[in-house]
Amino acid sequence: MEFEYQSTIVHQGVLFYVADGGDRAYFVHGGCIVSVHRRSREIGKFGLTLRGNAPGNRVVANYVRTELARLGRAWAAPQGSDDVFVDALGLLLPLTELDLCGRAELDVYDPYLVECMVSLPASALSLTLVHDRQQDRVLELLAEPAIVHPSSGFVYAVNEACFALVQAYLSELPSSLQVLTEGLFDGIPGVRPPLSGETRPTAVVVKGGRAAPTLSVRPRRYAERALRATVVSDFVQVRYIPATRRIWATRGGSLSLQMLCDLVAGADAILRRAAGASDDASAAVVEAVSAVAADPFFGTGSTSLTGAQRFALYQFILARWHLPSCYAALEGMLDRLDERPGAGAGDDDDGGEGGGGGGHGGSRAASAVAHAVNRVLREATVFGEVMRMLVNAAVVHAPAIADPAGASPPTTKHAREDAATGLELAVMMSDAETNALDADACELVEAAGARVLDGLYAGRGLVAATAPVGRALRPTSAVCAEAALLTAFGDSPAALRGAQYLFQLFRARLTRANISIVLNKNR
């Protein structure tokens, strides 16, 4: 949902967003948006409500009600409704309703709630629920929260059954919040009301698949009083239907070496055409290539391919293991080129390893492409295995993985960011408990992982790239030897793990560029 505003004002220490010519004001409360009007008595509340851990149940909402009651805050859960707004999560912490004013993010530490929200165990979650797009003067209420780990920044997939977007009608604000609106509109210039006395409804732009349902929340002091069956609202939800940008799917098209060669040969032409096109799918591809391939990444130093060509390799690997990719979208763009380039890839000068899958043809171009995609998969696999080993070593004795002063050059920013992403997945894939590493140990693991990534991104080879951590992890040579046998055209558990690490780092780079992966379920 999007809410336009014209200006902002700070009143009673809370930031209000002024709309409708000064007649309406919004404020953020624990990730929800609350609306008050100068003349109308309606109070609108928009936000996510808590549901269950699977479609059709309300176990999460009921659990939060129980916890609020245990803390002596049963009054915070609405009466006569199955829905509990997400701002109630803030009241599970030592916060008051006033403390939640202005908060667009919430932290969750309850292990049961954490696992219900992301279907994985974790020590804590940070939920972002509202974005203030100041340049557009728009408050954006997210259809599902953006969930990350507060310390590592790892981005989680959201359990859709846990949340639902709802518009609520409140006959009054909670008593603790009523002080916020006293005298609010005295300091806001208003427009003259129409002579007819009628006011136009406020448009709320809905970008989701359907309108948010409405409900009425009865006053706390009238908990047993029946609600009106029908509510006439000051708001009208306006559906916004954009041109599709859903280029992501978990299924690729033709995952043959020949098609990959064609894509690599045409990648730069695809990108040039997409940059000049007006459709949203082309714009999404251009943004994704820029976000992922602008900085060094897997295959940067070990292949002579361009950023667009390496991007095609990443999509092949993700599609090959049924992870979200835009490989099928790239195939469609290749077919629409006016003149389809002949298959031909840049030569790979690394020369130390054979390319699996060479049975598809004896051409030099095909061999170079196979070699390049294998190198990307092998680098991602080695990074993942080394990170898992670092986590296990840090649990036993974290100082052992510290880099001796001056032994290695400073790591780059993109390597540190990618290593932080890899750490979270490594913890889940290792034998360590989720909370076994303290902050200092996590920092040591991330630093060691960044040193490995800088070596891989620079094309130093698997053995040389892992040398900085060899003192603490003596079996790295065995890991490198095993990875050197992997091929992107075969099947093995190690290759799958490498593809998963590639995807996590790939998705994190998109997230840092404010790009979301929304699957096209028609593919």
From Swiss-Prot:
Residues 340-364 are annotated as: Disordered. The keyword Amino-acid biosynthesis does not apply. Disulfide bonds: none annotated. It is found in: Virion tegument; Host cytoplasm; Host nucleus. Keywords: Host cytoplasm, Host nucleus, Virion, Virion tegument. Residues 353-362 have a biased composition (Gly residues). GO terms for cellular component: host cell cytoplasm; host cell nucleus; viral tegument. InterPro entries: Herpes_UL21 (IPR004936). Signal peptide: none annotated. It comes from the Viruses. The keyword Electron transport does not apply. Pfam families: Herpes_UL21. Its main location: virion. Belongs to the alphaherpesvirinae UL21 protein family. May participate in DNA packaging/capsid maturation events. Promotes efficient incorporation of tegument proteins UL46, UL49, and US3 into virions. May also play a role in capsid transport to the trans-Golgi network (TGN). Interacts (via C-terminus) with UL16. This is Tegument protein UL21. It comes from Suid herpesvirus 1 (strain NIA-3). The gene is UL21.
